[in-house]
């Protein structure tokens, strides 16, 4: 998918400023109490998602996250298909006071072992 220059600049800034968690660490972090938060649209979530993950679409994140995850100290692993929406969501959560918000580097595709073909796939901050 081709993104607009402004959208990609926002996503790149989020990727640079929020920690990307390697997919090999996701299951361990979730087992230790982290919440995997699927921020894709409901239709995407219904097709596939990380087992046990919560769902809150990116478009409703700011309105619904406080009811869904009231603890500002909670470790939250935002994810989408690749990187952009996950990183943008983690950045938004940090602005809202969720200091342990991160994103899953490579998103669901990487978690499932699929190659990340997004243009910023090699820019993930670990």
Q: Which residues does each PLM region occupy?
A:
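Rhodanese-like catalytic fold shared by cysteine-dependent sulfurtransferases
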Residues: 1-35, 42-75, 81-126
């Amino acid at each position: 998918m081709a993104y607009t220059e402004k959208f990609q600049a926002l996503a790149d800034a989020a990727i640079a400023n929020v920690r990307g968690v390697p997919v090999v660490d996701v299951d361990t972090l979730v087992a230790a109490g982290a919440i995997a938060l699927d921020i894709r649209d409901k239709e995407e979530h219904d097709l596939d998602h990380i087992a046990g993950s919560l769902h809150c679409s990116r478009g409703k994140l700011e309105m619904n996250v406080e009811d869904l995850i009231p603890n500002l100290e909670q470790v939250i692993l935002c994810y989408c298909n690749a990187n952009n929406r996950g990183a943008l969501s983690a950045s938004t959560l940090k602005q809202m006071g969720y200091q342990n918000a991160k994103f899953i580097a490579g998103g669901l595709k990487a978690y499932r072992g699929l190659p990340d073909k997004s243009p910023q796939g090699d820019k993930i901050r670990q």
